[in-house]
Each structure stands twice: as structure tokens, then as C-alpha cells.
Amino acid sequence: SLFEDNAEFGLGLRLAADLHTATARKRLEELRDELGDETVDAILDAPQQYESELSQQRARVDALKSRLDSMTGAKVEDLRSVADHLLRRSVWIVGGDGWAYDIGSAGVDHVLASGRNVNILVLDTEVYSNTGGQASKSTPLGAVAKFAAGGKVTTKKDMALQATAYGNVYVARVAMGADPQQTLKAFREAEAYDGPSLILAYSHCIAHGIDMRKGLDQQYAAVASG
């Protein structure tokens, strides 16, 4: 999203998902006598950090729903309606650098400070791409862009450094064209991290004046040049 409410909406989705999960866990606990300790504890205590663990939890929830189909009662219906929320929900907030570094920076900071399990992906073109490629807070020192024909005279805002100040935020910088394996590793680590994460992804753009068919090559060159 370009707009300044992107982070707030994403955090709202996280809060809603957490509320649904808390409700589902409560409904499951209410049926402990009918379902048995083994079934209830297996679901409530299951780790859900990695894909393999999520697959196992998905199988448990499917088995639970099958059992609920053979049961009746108001509590059964209540649990059936929220059973899918026993699976961990992944929330990603995706936006550009104009949003994250500038118009929506306060919202991004609020999300990171919340400590909630929310992932933020910033597609960083280092210019205001949506309005024609003007120099921005994300533009590096010396880079030539609109409104900076002689080279930008100030440095790029270090958003990664700001995020690390909280001490509990997963932070990564990636460029798929420079190192696809590191990019994949960062996404997996951010997804598995139980807390806020921030990935700053260098992104090529038509505003760079390049042949877009060679965008990944340009990413490699940008990283290699420092």
C-alpha cells in the first residue's frame, strides 16, 4: 500500500487474529471432558513455528473438526465455528519505501514497538516511484534523481538501525538479484520469528531508467557497488 494507514490495518489484522485464536482455545478447553485431555493438550501445546509443525497442527485440527461433526450442542457449534483459528495466522504488511520511510513511518514504528507477531516487507526502490522517481528519504547519498540532479546531499535514512534499537525486532536487508538464497533465508526466519520482523528488500524500478528485463542484474550491481 502507498497509503499511511497500511501499518495500522496490518496490526489490526494481527489483533483480530489473536482474539480469534484466544476464543478458539477457550472453546476447546470448555469441551475437554468430551474430547479428552490427550486431544485438547495436543492442540493447545503444539509448537507452530515452522512449516512442518504447522502441517502437523493442521492435521490435528482437521481430526478435531471430524470429531465435532459427530457431536451436538451449543458448545460444539461454537468451537466448530472458530476451530480453524487454532492454526497460527501469518500477517504480512507490504508497502513501498515512500510509505515506510516517510508518510507511514509513524505507523511502522508503532507496529514494531507493539511487540506483536507481525511481518513488514518494504519494497525499497530508493525513490518516490509512484510520483515519478523523485529523491526521497530512502535515496542514498550522491544518487541522481528528480529534485536531486546534482546528487542527493544527505544520506539514506537507516530504517534497519532504527528497528534494531528496540532489541526484539528481526531485521534483514535483502536483494533477490544479489543473493536469492539469503533472501529466501530471511523470509523464512522472519516468518518463524515470534515477534515483529522487518525486511527491507531492494527493488528495481522503471524510475531507475534501466532495462527492466535486466532488473535482477541491476540489483546485483547495486549491491556489489556498496
Residue ranges and their predicted role:
Residues 1, 107-111, 115, 134-144, ...:
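Short secondary-structure boundary/capping segments
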Residues 1, 71-134, 171, 177-194:
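Thiamine diphosphate
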Residues 1-75, 104, 211, 215-226:
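Patatin-like phospholipase A catalytic core
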Residues 2-42, 52, 85-87, 139-192:
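Conserved thiamine diphosphate
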Residues 60-69, 79-80, 159-168, 174:
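An acidic, phosphate/nucleotide-engaging active-site surface
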Residues 117-120, 144-148, 196-198, 223-225:
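Glycine-rich loops and low-complexity Gly/Arg-rich segments
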Residues 183-226:
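Glycine/aspartate-rich loop-and-adjacent alpha/beta segment that forms the canonical ThDP
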